[in-house]
């Protein structure tokens, strides 16, 4: 019965040893480091010299079963050396004693940026890193502003508005039909020099006919001629009336002297 129990315990230990070998560098059960030559103790201390295992040492028991290697505790000081032997050559592990002077030497070439919140300067003063304050008068404070001349833009807007108004007036003039000046023609025909008045009246009718046909060019030409003849008729008629009045006054004055 005891042999069966020892055999089962041996099988369990074998399984645990295989699992620990797959797990990596450290055998958590037997507490030995795995190397190419076998299992080597990781403790250099004198008190553990008797517990070192140089190889896969196994002793036969009374029942013929193999005994597992002796268990040892882990020495943390040798962990780094064991890990370094397993890493690639391009990965180098340095101790803190080596990194500290290196960091002190490089610190002079580095620049550190610190962000501080809610540290706005007081009114009319600025805070410097050494804790000193400097007072600034309103004359010393310079505010950089950017300005540009807007006169050219205003002139451009005025020219654009003038051009647009002229264009609209020209468009309205072209769209509006020419005037026939019929009333002025009738007045020149009845009250002024009637031959020119009759011609102006005739041209005013021609203007209406051209507008009805849609010939605005002919209508505008007839309208200008009618206006010219009507004004000329009024001018001549006014001159005739003034001449007749002067002649009548002169005749009456001569008759009174007689």
UniProtKB/Swiss-Prot annotation:
Cytoplasmic-side segments: 1-181
Cellular component GO terms, alphabetical: cell body; dendritic shaft; dendritic spine; early endosome membrane; excitatory synapse; intracellular membrane-bounded organelle; plasma membrane; postsynaptic density
UniProt record, GO biological process: intracellular protein transport; positive regulation of synapse assembly; synaptic vesicle clustering
Top-level lineage group: Eukaryota
Transmembrane segments: 182-202
Family membership: Belongs to the CD225/Dispanin family.
Protein function: May regulate AMPA receptor content at nascent synapses, and have a role in postsynaptic development and maturation.
Assembly and binders: Homodimer. Interacts with GRIA1 and GRIA2.
Protein name: Synapse differentiation-inducing gene protein 1
Organism: Bos taurus (Bovine)
Gene expressing this chain: SYNDIG1
